[in-house]
Every structure is written in C-alpha cells, then in structure tokens.
Amino acid sequence: MPKNKGKGGKNRRRGKNENESEKRELVFKEDGQEYAQVIKMLGNGRLEAMLFDGVKRLFHIRGKLRKKVWINTSDIILVGLREYQDNKADVILKYNADEARSLKAYGELPEHAKINETDTFGPGDDDEIQFDDIGDDDEDIDDI
C-alpha cells in the first residue's frame, strides 16, 4: 500500500473565498448583450429569464459561472444574445444587489425593475392580506 503523501482533498484545492468582499468594476452591456431578470431556474445549467425589453428567453449558464456563481430567481444578469438562435442566449455575468442598484441609478435598467424582491417585473400595487376578527374576544374555549 502506498503512503498518503498528498496535502488534502478537493476542499483544500478549492481554497477560501476571500475575494467576495472586494468590489469589482461595474460591467456595462456591449453590442449583442442585454440585461435580464431571472424568472425560473430550470436545472441542468439552464434558466428562464425576461429581458428588460419584454422578451422571455431560455438561457444557458456558461461553464465559467456554472458551479462558482449561484444564480437565483429575481437576480439581474448580463446575457449574450445568440445570432443564430433567437429564443436562446447565454449568461455572461451575475450582478449582486449593489451593482444592480448602481445600474438602475445610471439608467441602464428601467425604473420598474425590482432588485431585491421576489415579485418581478412591472409596477404593481402591493397586495396586503387583511385578517378580520370573526369571533368574540370574550368567548372562552371551555364554553364552546
């Protein structure tokens, strides 16, 4: 039997994510790129998102982002449109909440874009649930 002369497993190779606190430079869209908001995660590196011009498309998460950057619903992403397939596109970059707010402040994202909320797209009134008190407060459980 050979001796274990290694220095650890895959967790050691993976290292620590110390660069999360560092701010990166804000990336704006170029030709052939658009901003979108994630509607639904489909699995297998795919997701459904709505471009801010109103078109819903199927998106593919590229290999560089696949297991390193976690994308959730209502995230703002930068996508590269495909010239040969109109209904599909590729995810290039995921913006965090601060970067998305900056994009909105610069006028890159429309005003109706909701950044940190689960309800996506469109100016909608906030539906609040109202509960009515049906029973008497004096009524005791033992009296029923």
From Swiss-Prot:
<feature type="compositionally biased region" description="Basic and acidic residues">
    <location>
        <begin position="16"/>
        <end position="26"/>
    </location>
</feature>
<feature type="compositionally biased region" description="Acidic residues">
    <location>
        <begin position="124"/>
        <end position="144"/>
    </location>
</feature>
<dbReference type="InterPro" id="IPR012340">
    <property type="entry name" value="NA-bd_OB-fold"/>
</dbReference>
<comment type="similarity">
    <text>Belongs to the eIF-1A family.</text>
</comment>
<keyword id="KW-0963">Cytoplasm</keyword>
<dbReference type="InterPro" id="IPR001253">
    <property type="entry name" value="TIF_eIF-1A"/>
</dbReference>
<dbReference type="Pfam" id="PF01176">
    <property type="entry name" value="eIF-1a"/>
</dbReference>
<feature type="compositionally biased region" description="Basic residues">
    <location>
        <begin position="1"/>
        <end position="15"/>
    </location>
</feature>
<keyword id="KW-0694">RNA-binding</keyword>
<feature type="domain" description="S1-like">
    <location>
        <begin position="22"/>
        <end position="96"/>
    </location>
</feature>
<keyword id="KW-0820">tRNA-binding</keyword>
<comment type="function">
    <text>Component of the 43S pre-initiation complex (43S PIC), which binds to the mRNA cap-proximal region, scans mRNA 5'-untranslated region, and locates the initiation codon. This protein enhances formation of the cap-proximal complex. Together with EIF1, facilitates scanning, start codon recognition, promotion of the assembly of 48S complex at the initiation codon (43S PIC becomes 48S PIC after the start codon is reached), and dissociation of aberrant complexes.</text>
</comment>
<dbReference type="InterPro" id="IPR006196">
    <property type="entry name" value="RNA-binding_domain_S1_IF1"/>
</dbReference>
<comment type="subunit">
    <text>Component of the 43S pre-initiation complex (43S PIC), which is composed of the 40S ribosomal subunit, EIF1, eIF1A (EIF1AX), eIF3 complex, EIF5 and eIF2-GTP-initiator tRNA complex (eIF2 ternary complex). Interacts with EIF5; this interaction contributes to the maintenance of EIF1 within the open 43S PIC. Interacts through its C-terminal domain (CTD) with the CTD of EIF5B; from the location of the start codon by the 43S complex until the formation of the 80S complex.</text>
</comment>
<keyword id="KW-0648">Protein biosynthesis</keyword>
<dbReference type="GO" id="GO:0003743">
    <property type="term" value="F:translation initiation factor activity"/>
</dbReference>
<dbReference type="InterPro" id="IPR018104">
    <property type="entry name" value="TIF_eIF-1A_CS"/>
</dbReference>
<dbReference type="GO" id="GO:0005737">
    <property type="term" value="C:cytoplasm"/>
</dbReference>
<feature type="region of interest" description="Disordered">
    <location>
        <begin position="1"/>
        <end position="26"/>
    </location>
</feature>
<keyword id="KW-0396">Initiation factor</keyword>
<protein>
    <recommendedName>
        <fullName>Eukaryotic translation initiation factor 1A</fullName>
    </recommendedName>
</protein>
<dbReference type="GO" id="GO:0000049">
    <property type="term" value="F:tRNA binding"/>
</dbReference>
<feature type="region of interest" description="Disordered">
    <location>
        <begin position="114"/>
        <end position="144"/>
    </location>
</feature>
